[in-house]
């Protein structure tokens, strides 16, 4: 017997390099494919090709997409990709009955309630989980920040642009780094330090402070040298990265009252979970003076699921 088309949804996580599409049913997904976005002129071409290749009984009429960039109306423009589209027009072009488009990090945040325990790696002493708001923060291409609030058995997503809030230095050494960064950007956002490019910015700022010429490094170069211990400045850059992420995560926990925990997503730290666990992140997270005991009770967990945005989209409430 064929599957119910109303039970199926096509889901897609559209990044700057790849578009990942899958078919979701009852919170799980299958038929995963990675398509290189450089091969397509528009999103409708990539998604249309994916749908056309599916067996007839697996072609959904409903969809949910996650895109890198703000979603506040019908017209959507991706941040790191020369694609833009109308949600209404895309829905019509593909003959879909419903189509929901959300920010990619919002979709990642929506995955948290559905993550198995094995995909939640504790950073710091394990804490018993309690009910309450959940914060999600993720350094990657940018810095994603979202929150989830429980309400009568469901979760309400609070998306935002917290990665563009002001970067808060917590030590004199960090203040010097921020001063160097301010010579490049009048407003130094958290994302300027807590992202892939931000890690390079930290390395270059430290080189400036140390009076040496920086090597032309990529984010992967910085982390590779840091993990091997072959470059003291890269080691310091990774340490500062983890420390400042702890400060920002602690601020998020206090702001939303994240008694349900703070979850960290993003590919940067996923590859170095042991080094991250032994970094100053957790100490800095708790270092909030009178509220240290409050933060000590809040768990911080690294998301190990490789495609959390797809898991979130698979469970995103859709119009009937």
Curated annotation (Swiss-Prot):
Tell me the HAMAP family matching this sequence. Glucokinase
Which portions of this protein are annotated as coiled-coil regions? none
Principal localisation = cytoplasm
Q: Where, subcellularly, is it found?
A: Cytoplasm
Q: What class of enzyme is it?
A: transferase
The EC number of this protein is: 2.7.1.2
The record's section on SUPFAM superfamilies has: Actin-like ATPase domain (SSF53067)
List the protein's name.
Glucokinase
Q: Which GO terms describe its molecular function?
A: ATP binding; D-glucose binding; glucokinase activity
A Pfam family per the record: Glucokinase
One of its GO biological process terms is: glycolytic process
Q: Which gene encodes it?
A: glk
Which of this chain's residues are annotated to bind ATP? Answer: 12-17
InterPro entries membership:
ATPase_NBD (IPR043129), Bacterial_glucokinase (IPR050201), Glucokinase (IPR003836)
- State the organism named in the record: Nitrobacter hamburgensis (strain DSM 10229 / NCIMB 13809 / X14)
Q: Which UniProt keywords apply?
A: ATP-binding, Cytoplasm, Glycolysis, Kinase, Nucleotide-binding, Plasmid, Transferase
Show the catalytic activity. D-glucose + ATP = D-glucose 6-phosphate + ADP + H(+)
Q: Which family does it belong to?
A: Belongs to the bacterial glucokinase family.
Gene Ontology CC terms: cytosol
Q: Which PANTHER family match?
A: GLUCOKINASE
Q: Can you tell which superkingdom this protein's organism belongs to? A: Bacteria
């Amino acid at each position: 017997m064929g599957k119910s088309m109303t039970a199926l949804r096509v889901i897609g996580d559209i990044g700057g390099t790849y578009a990942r599409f899958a078919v979701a049913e009852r919170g799980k997904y299958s038929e995963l494919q990675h398509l290189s976005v450089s091969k397509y002129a528009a999103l409708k071409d990539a998604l249309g090709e994916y749908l056309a290749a599916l067996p007839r009984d697996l072609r959904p009429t409903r969809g949910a997409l996650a895109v890198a960039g703000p979603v506040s109306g019908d017209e959507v423009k991706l941040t790191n990709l020369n694609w833009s589209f109308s949600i209404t027009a895309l829905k019509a072009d593909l003959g879909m009955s419903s189509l929901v488009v959300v920010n990619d990090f919002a979709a990642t945040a929506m995955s948290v309630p559905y993550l198995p325990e094995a995909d939640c790696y504790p950073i710091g002493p394990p804490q018993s989980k309690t009910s309450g708001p959940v914060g999600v923060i993720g350094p990657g291409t940018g810095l994603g920040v979202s929150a989830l609030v429980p309400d009568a058995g469901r979760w309400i997503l609070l998306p935002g642009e917290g990665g563009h809030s002001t970067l808060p230095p917590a030590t004199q050494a960090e203040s010097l780094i921020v001063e160097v960064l301010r010579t490049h950007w009048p407003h130094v956002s958290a994302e300027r330090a807590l992202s892939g490019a931000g890690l390079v910015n930290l390395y270059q700022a430290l080189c400036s402070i140390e009076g040496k010429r920086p090597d032309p490094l990529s984010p992967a170069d910085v982390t590779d040298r840091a993990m091997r211990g072959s470059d003291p400045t890269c080691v310091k850059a990774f340490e500062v990265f983890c420390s400042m992420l702890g400060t920002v995560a602690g601020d998020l926990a206090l702001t939303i009252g994240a008694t349900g925990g703070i979850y960290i997503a993003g590919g940067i730290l996923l590859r170095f979970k042991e080094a991250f666990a032994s970094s100053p992140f957790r100490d800095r997270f708790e270092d909030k003076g009178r509220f240290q005991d409050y933060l000590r009770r809040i768990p911080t967990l690294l998301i190990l699921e490789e495609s959390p945005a797809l898991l979130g989209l698979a469970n995103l409430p859709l119009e009937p």
